[in-house]
Amino acid sequence: MIRWFKCFMRMIFEQVGLNMESVLWSSKPYGSSRSIVRKIGTNLSLIQCPRVQFQLTSQAAEGNHPHQFREDAVASFADVGWVAQEEGEVSTRLRSEVWSKTAQPLPGELHQPGHSLGRQDSVPNLLHEEPAPRSTVIANEEAMQKISALENELATLRAQIAKIVILQEQQNLTAAGLSPVASAAVPCVPPPPPPPPPPPLPPPALQQSMSAIELIRERKNRKTNSGPIPTENGPKKPEIPNMLEILKDMNSVKLRSVKKSSGDTKPKVADPTDPAALIAEALKKKFAYRYRRDSQSESDKVIPKSETNTKTEVVLFGPHMLKSTGKMKTLIEKS
């Protein structure tokens, strides 16, 4: 099998024009990457296909030289995905193929940028757009008329609001004391007078030395010296109580105990149908029983047996029915 393979390889190399020994065992002039397949391919008389070369060209250069790459054009990245529409067929072609079919312009004609390049023919021309239709122009005019009408309505509304505000201010002034005749005669409301200047502040030394209580006393003395102030016909406004005056003599107040005799106070006759009296009586009984029970636990008073024996009611159920086991006595003795 190996001998047959060797013979087959020799026959192939002889037909190509190579010696098998020189191919396999001779030195490699092309380096270690040179293979037998490459050597066979270089010796065969095959037509080599042209390699694709890409060249980047600017749009300005294309516009300046419209007939430069028509004969032997080199493909560029601009041709990738470029679609030419011709004779109802859509296909991807190079610009050179389309230019060869189009008629070449005369040298005397002016260069038109919209029709110089096939690529510009395929791209929609945004500079030379069609004029807007008449219907859109009419619609724009109608919209402008509506906007102007709305602006006029807004202006009238503003004027009405201003009149209403002026009337309200005039009514407020008449209620404050002005006569309605004078307010009706004046078309515009006069500006309000400037506020009176604030009273001069006392010197800082007096403010620091005088306390709040002293100020209150001085004001009281001034009121008493000036005499009674004539009261107005209108209702008198209630004065706001001052807490400093109320709490001023709190430490000097002493309470006195008063003893009341039992004959002075007469018990009120309670109405049996009054719900408030019934609730008060029930609460008195409840809290009296609780107070009595707490006082008994505090004083550790022993209830005499005579009181318990006088009870007529017989308790059916209770702790007296339990049998004594003696555990309570042991617990009491231990404690």
UniProtKB/Swiss-Prot annotation:
Family membership: Belongs to the MTFR1 family.
GO biological process entries: aerobic respiration; mitochondrial fission; mitochondrion organization
Alphabetical keyword list: Coiled coil, Mitochondrion, Transit peptide
Gene: MTFR1
UniProt-annotated stretches for the region Disordered: 219-240
Any coiled-coil regions, as ranges: 134-170
Cell location: Mitochondrion
Statement: the UniProt record of this protein carries the keyword Transcription: no
Transit peptide: 1-48
UniProt-listed InterPro entries: Mtfr1 (IPR007972)
Function as written in the Swiss-Prot or TrEMBL entry: May play a role in mitochondrial aerobic respiration. May also regulate mitochondrial organization and fission.
Region called Necessary and sufficient to promote mitochondrial fission, residue ranges: 182-309
Organism: Gallus gallus (Chicken)
GO CC annotations, alphabetized: mitochondrion
Superkingdom of source: Eukaryota
Keyword Calcium (UniProt): no
Tissue expression notes: Widely expressed in embryonic tissues with higher expression in cartilage and hypertrophic chondrocytes. Specifically expressed in hypertrophic chondrocytes (at protein level).
This protein's name: Mitochondrial fission regulator 1
